[in-house]
């Protein structure tokens, strides 16, 4: 049976606990900073920053290192499921946004799947492997001789590994300076007489030269292989053993282990820098990707619109409830800058819920409908008070960009849900991965829109609220510029 050294549920749980402890320490200044504000502000900043901070923490650490601090302590690494190479920043981002769906299901997919992949792993095309579970059996010299006689050229996995190990040690030892090789042999002599070693080396390997003695000593356990061989050498051993093994299944198993170890070695030796051109390239590709999801964007728009119209004519006390939550007049309220941060974080949280909830099928349209109900309830209440223009002036300047970003996330979420229902000839994870990875570039565009919308809402909207003609004119210009960019063709 071909076995990939997947991380166990217990290992991933321990790694997650460690990471959550680190995230909690990082987020402590946020709780201290918001203590002077009302409960509404504290709750909004705490929940939004927790979701955003967790997504950033995992995406940046896993993108750069193919592991997180918690996983590193548990010797766990995240690799591409096809190539076994370290993952990209894009894969790290996708697997951690989709964490929303996994958390909603209490991570049951990870527990139930044999490969311990959660939905986020399926969407990003990743696996989590354990370096501790990546091992092969090294047989004793006596067993090596016996198997060599019995198996002939039809090597089993154990014999293939032993043969490749001997060849690699002899090759490595031949490059040692004479003094180093001599000192190593003297170290071995401390535990066993050199004549005995030479005799057994000749019987086992067929030679008693210093390189063969060294290879025999490793096989016999007199010295650890890691004192001579590097991690890359072990990769070479597994690759060579995969050529020696007779069984096709064992060749495949050894090849997989070699690939996994190579990926881990690369992840440990190199840190991927985060380059600005990644963001610029994503922005450049956004219009093309937006045009591809236009039907889903329109569907999300109509869900939002119908929900708003439905709620507009229903009695609602949402505004009064929000005022009550905001606290009494003697409680300190944030200034425009903190308000902008609060709005941006909350909008990003909603965006992540829409995108990350896509695999749950019903989550994205449901969250879109809820936002429509809230918008329609507030709008309907103000319209009944004869303040329709106040409502439009308060919503449109920032709402054009904010709603566009929210609908983009909803569109991708709906498309992901449909990819699971109708996977075609592909597996459901393959179908999900195709959608999630392809449209991940729209994350950058959406983040930019939400940042701009947050600052507009905090700094500009209060100025334009009673300047109806200016607010509506600015909003129309925003629509023209934004959608000319999104719908442009090369």
Regions of interest found by a model, annotated:
Residues 1-241, 247, 260:
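Membrane-interfacial and juxtamembrane segments of integral membrane proteins
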Residues 2-12, 275-293, 338, 428-433:
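Cytosolic juxtamembrane amphipathic/interface segments immediately preceding
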Residues 91, 380-472:
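Hydrophobic alpha-helical transmembrane segments and adjacent short intramembrane/lumenal linkers
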Residues 240-292:
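Cytosolic juxtamembrane regions of integral membrane proteins
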Residues 291-317:
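N-terminal signal-anchor transmembrane alpha helix
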Residues 308-332, 370:
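Interfacial/capping segments of alpha-helical transmembrane domains
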Residues 337-401, 408:
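Pore-lining transmembrane helices
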Residues 468-482:
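Small-residue-rich transmembrane alpha-helices that serve as helix-helix interface/gating elements
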